[in-house]
């Protein structure tokens, strides 16, 4: 596996992983892979097909027959079975249910294998919750981004408003705290920093400051 070309960026919901990872990828001329979008796509399909989200077997089979394509561009597009669902995977319904789907071991096995295959094909910047610990454990550059729940809720609110959704900030804070608990306490691939990850608390930092910090660390590690 060409993990020496890969940068792993992990962290909780709303930590700014995707925005930061995109910019890092652009500056270093690497492919950006949003693994969270893949779990969101499976969740969206399950909701559309009215599959019981507590039926692990049904969801594993769903993941196996789901084709997810990530298209590079200024704003990465996500295709679900050939159809653009970039906006649909960011709905509150998907956001509130994706942790249920993501904690299923069989679903993770299917998607992790696909993520590793992507990393085999090209140097990548990959963000998620278990990239440095599970997906690309031998990646030379690993980062763990975090920020306060309030800061992350404000960022998520801005993202949702950009997609045209109404936002209740207090409710968002509550949902983020609940998701943190679920992600950190799940039996499979819990949200924890890799032992060799660089920890970055982005509270009060601009996106560009975080990006430059990561690039500085990457350049040092060459």
Curated annotation (Swiss-Prot):
**GO biological process annotation, one example:** nucleobase-containing small molecule interconversion
Reactions catalysed, semicolon-separated, are:
CMP + ATP = CDP + ADP; dCMP + ATP = dCDP + ADP
The cross-references to SUPFAM superfamilies, in alphabetical order and at most eight, read:
P-loop containing nucleoside triphosphate hydrolases (SSF52540)
Please give the name of this protein. Answer: Cytidylate kinase
- InterPro entries assigned: Cytidylate_kin, Cytidylate_kinase_dom, P-loop_NTPase
Q: What is its EC number?
A: 2.7.4.25
Tell me which UniProt keywords the record has, alphabetically. Answer: ATP-binding, Cytoplasm, Kinase, Nucleotide-binding, Transferase
Q: Which HAMAP family match?
A: Cytidyl_kinase_type1
Entries under Pfam families matching the protein = Cytidylate_kin (PF02224)
Name the protein family.
Belongs to the cytidylate kinase family. Type 1 subfamily.
Please give an example of a GO cellular component term from this record: cytosol
Subcellular location, record wording: Cytoplasm
| Species, as recorded | Desulforamulus reducens (strain ATCC BAA-1160 / DSM 100696 / MI-1)
- In the record, what terms sit under GO molecular function? ATP binding; CMP kinase activity; dCMP kinase activity
Q: Which residues bind ATP?
A: 11-19
Q: Does the keyword Cytoplasm apply?
A: yes
